[in-house]
Amino acid sequence: MTAAPGPALTPDTVVANGVRLHYRHGGSGPPVVLLHGWPQTGHCWRHVAGPLAADHTVIVPDLRGYGASDKPTGGMDKRTMAADVSALVRGLGHDRVAVVGHDRGGRVAHRWALDRPEEVTRFAVLDIAPTRATWQRMDAALGAKYWHWLFHLQPDLPERLAGADVEGYLRYFLEKWTYAREGLEPAAIAEYVRAFSQPGALRCGFDDYRAHPVDAEHDEADFSAGRRVTQPLLALWGAEGVMGQTLPMLDLWREYADDVRGRAIERCAHFVPEERPEEVLDELRTFLAEA
């Protein structure tokens, strides 16, 4: 299940785009940035980051509002979050990077590639479809499975209810969205619970979803203007997950990007980097080597 370890990554913090970001970095070679989703932190890349650092410079931030990074009261739209990570990597001396995003991190990667195409050489998205396309297909069947998108949009109430039992709320998703349960070991779940038990962490996580009106405005403007992703794009998803069983993933990405490849990963649901890290590594190494 766990890939062979590579170089250890070093934790650090930096102020980027006005917020303090925690990140880990290590290795040498072409730079690649790994972006996590909800309800997680950069810890979700623990099985992938080290081995990938054997031949890449790997940068793993906690996105604004998550993990050990600042918990601001605004700026959870994907344009701002992408600008944060852009400032981080430029501060580290990298003008052009490959990006890999899981879940919400994939949405940040998509926005980064559109807003700053000169910085993103290629990117991979794990277990997400384009945001605009997903909302367009939010019928009763998909809404019943992705109800949290609608619930997390509500002001204040998600924090009040989830805050009464942070561990119970997170475990619901971490367990229900997982096929290969051994990939999310108890220590990892405990780390995510700890991270979201910090002051402001639940609010920021829900604000990530509540930024949808702003994100939708940006997405619609790009689509209407015919602005597409021109970089090579790799899409991977869990064959047992909601996305893979509900939506035509590659077809949807081809509506938004010119150069798309990818596949479903068997015996895997949503948490792809943890459930099937060796397959993710194989796919990423092949994809990144094409640069």
Spans of features found by a protein language model:
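Short strand-coil-strand connectors
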Residues: 15-17, 36
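Proline-centered flexible-loop/turn and helix-kink motifs
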Residues: 39, 54, 117-118, 258, ...
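Conserved HGGG/HGGXW glycine-rich cap/lid loop of the alpha/beta-hydrolase fold
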Residues: 24-68
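Catalytic histidine-centered segment of alpha/beta-hydrolase-like enzymes
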Residues: 268-276, 281
